[in-house]
């Protein structure tokens, strides 16, 4: 990783190489990797690198101050642990501080019984946020001397600085989240805690020995200060001075109440009972009130290093750790809060040594999750740089591992200090008050969705039910208000729905043409070729470009639909046609085609105000009713008795007149009389 000069790129590369979880495919800052030279991303990287350089310098100054101010000797008893003699304790902790650059042979990874008890600290103050961020993420099998603050571990760190990360095969290995948790237990209040050994303060800057399978730290010359320049926790929005002051004040307030305790030695799970340092969960620091915790230890613990600054840990080969014991915990569900900048790294959940955690915590807990190499892998929070600022509850499954590490004895060798415990301890973890960082701007999709939602709400509020006209026949949505209602061809439309099928212009209040189920404006209908599908007049044969009149299944121009006799327009007037499809008005039709009376020779027309024609048919002739009478006496003839018709030589007579006419004639003609 020496080819990267920019710390931002170094951190991004390191995140991708972590085998604890899958790195974000969009990169560290929620930016598409294929986007190229994004000016916003370049500016963010520049600011990030500048802040990290400042944190390096402040960290060195604080470490030098810690080495000068913290005494080496006064240590309190371990909470719940056994006591050793002063000579043994100085061999464990004090002797490691006198060695300068001496490299000890690596120790084999320890294995522990599954029934071991977890050592929990009672009041160990944590590191400030700057120190916690300066600690590197370590996972994989660790080998090396148990050095708490000396420069012994730098030799091993420099040798393994360029090794690629490998899978964690040892259950006692640390995840980067565990490393943060342990770090929060070792920061004393500067100048106010004489009982804390320099080994605790120096554990921040010391190079932790790592095997070739561990994550690569940055190399540093042996002559330099033990503080390694490995800023891999991304915390660009945090002010180092403010965070340090807040942490120190919180530690000083509790220094008189609780003695300094041990770290929790549950393999890769480190729990801080004192004031917490910022934990990084799901890409965001958890924010909440700071509360002290009082962990309950299930059984007395036999520890090889009873000093308060001993910092017992169960991992073999981690600098600054002494003896520790293991236990199997049942991890209760913990609240996981997401807040602050999205560039933080989520802590991987520990799984090798279980520890019972109280589920009713009032703050956020350090990252807990599955760890490679364990038998039972649980699911834990992943890296989530794009997560929103909302609290999220994450239920952690019960994590277990087959093996637990042995504790370290005072002479640096493995000691069998495992104890059985009938129950798992429970620890309350506090909230971490952090300064929230800059929010990421919402994406374009989120902005569009918000705009659509607001538009729908405004439309629902703006249209009362009283203005509802009905449903649009085109979009099937309700039509509210006269301003958007449009009625055409007996149907209801939105004015935005009733548009030209060719140019999509609104047709409300304009001339339109309905052709084959579509409506067109006049311009598109006349000049775009749509007139080829228009109807033609049955009489003149021309295209009907204006109003159309349909009659008898045929289409006509209104001006062409006229009576052939009087030439009057028959639009809206009763009409009829003859066998030759000639159009007549009713009056002219009867005049031309009505039957004529055989008596008077006039056409038999229907009476005024009626369409029915009344006529009398006699001797295959048509007569008006008033023309059907006796020619001699004028008697009206009909079918009644005494009024019957007796024709004679095509003349109409009643019976008496008919007899008279016959008497005047010769008798020969009487044989040919007819009665009608």
Swiss-Prot record:
Gene3D superfamilies per UniProt: Cysteine Rich Protein
Posttranslational modification: Phosphorylated during mitosis.
GO terms for MF: metal ion binding; transcription corepressor activity
Stretches assigned to coiled coil: none
InterPro entries the record matches: Ajuba-like (IPR047172), Ajuba-like_LIM1 (IPR047245), Ajuba-like_LIM2 (IPR047247), Ajuba-like_LIM3 (IPR047248), Znf_LIM (IPR001781)
Location (main, coarse): cytoplasm
Biased composition (Gly residues): 243-253
Localization, UniProt: Cytoplasm; Nucleus; Cytoplasm, P-body; Cell junction, Adherens junction
Limits of the LIM zinc-binding domain: 470-531, 535-595, 595-664
Region Necessary for nuclear localization, residue ranges: 472-676
UniProt-annotated stretches for the region Disordered: 104-163, 189-389
Region feature Interaction with RB1, mapped onto this chain: 404-442
Listed Low complexity bias regions: 201-213, 232-242, 343-360
UniProt keyword terms in alphabetical order: Cell junction, Cytoplasm, LIM domain, Metal-binding, Nucleus, Phosphoprotein, Repeat, Repressor, RNA-mediated gene silencing, Transcription, Transcription regulation, Tumor suppressor, Zinc
Stretch list, region Mediates nuclear export: 54-134
GO biological processes: cell migration; cytoskeleton organization; miRNA-mediated gene silencing by inhibition of translation; miRNA-mediated post-transcriptional gene silencing; negative regulation of canonical Wnt signaling pathway; negative regulation of DNA-templated transcription; negative regulation of hippo signaling; negative regulation of osteoblast differentiation
Region of interest called Interaction with EGLN1/PHD2, as start-end residue ranges on this chain: 186-260
Tissue: Expressed in normal and breast cancer tissues (at protein level). Ubiquitous.
PANTHER family in UniProt: LIM DOMAIN-CONTAINING PROTEIN 1, LIM DOMAIN-CONTAINING PROTEIN JUB
Purpose of the protein: Adapter or scaffold protein which participates in the assembly of numerous protein complexes and is involved in several cellular processes such as cell fate determination, cytoskeletal organization, repression of gene transcription, cell-cell adhesion, cell differentiation, proliferation and migration. Positively regulates microRNA (miRNA)-mediated gene silencing and is essential for P-body formation and integrity. Acts as a hypoxic regulator by bridging an association between the prolyl hydroxylases and VHL enabling efficient degradation of HIF1A.
Name of the featured protein: LIM domain-containing protein 1
Provenance organism: Homo sapiens (Human)
